[in-house]
């Protein structure tokens, strides 16, 4: 009886310590939701990188969506976050992250911070993340949220991501999270030799192809991955494409 009581108390203390380590606003309910998301939406669809799966288990996605949509945070769908932007569905976040083949030593540039969720996931599998958001309200909100959650290896700034972040270049990997009909030349120039770039490429107002671009010297190679639907990249990208 004494041993059983000791074991019971130990389990309670362990659970309390585990909950205490969770970010503010997280709970066992959301931990279970993330585990279900990983098992049912990611692993079954061939996401295999263990570090990516761990990141998806750990980052509290529900804190990055509007309060009215928290109940949908772990569903297999994109969600609106305001300013005409969305947070990508979990599978796409995991797929794009996995395509970069990060090992933990890389410096990554993200174009389109949005809610900050993708940057948070990247921060778990890369050394440093630099993220740019053109929508000032989203930029400010995401920056404050990422800081409050303790993501110290993320640098965020407001601006037009089309031109990249030349001061911090080159980057081992670049991710564009909005649709564009061409790969911005400044981003190709800021990609390190041997680096990888992933983006939704095609008509910004229709369906696109998720593509992977690799660089070897001045040789850039492109692989088509799958069909996707992203919101348009705004700013100079639309001007350059002739859209208004």
UniProtKB/Swiss-Prot annotation:
Pfam families: PCMT. The active site is at residue 88. Keywords: Cytoplasm, Methyltransferase, S-adenosyl-L-methionine, Transferase. One of its GO terms (biological process) is protein modification process. It catalyses: [protein]-L-isoaspartate + S-adenosyl-L-methionine = [protein]-L-isoaspartate alpha-methyl ester + S-adenosyl-L-homocysteine. It is an enzyme of class 2 (transferase). GO terms for molecular function: protein-L-isoaspartate (D-aspartate) O-methyltransferase activity. Its main location: cytoplasm. Its EC number is 2.1.1.77. It comes from the Bacteria. The keyword ATP-binding does not apply. One of its GO terms (cellular component) is cytoplasm. Transmembrane segments: none annotated. It is found in: Cytoplasm. Belongs to the methyltransferase superfamily. L-isoaspartyl/D-aspartyl protein methyltransferase family. HAMAP family: PIMT (MF_00090). PANTHER family: PROTEIN-L-ISOASPARTATE O-METHYLTRANSFERASE, PROTEIN-L-ISOASPARTATE(D-ASPARTATE) O-METHYLTRANSFERASE. NCBIfam families: pimt (TIGR00080), PRK00312.1 (NF001453). Catalyzes the methyl esterification of L-isoaspartyl residues in peptides and proteins that result from spontaneous decomposition of normal L-aspartyl and L-asparaginyl residues. It plays a role in the repair and/or degradation of damaged proteins. This is Protein-L-isoaspartate O-methyltransferase 2.
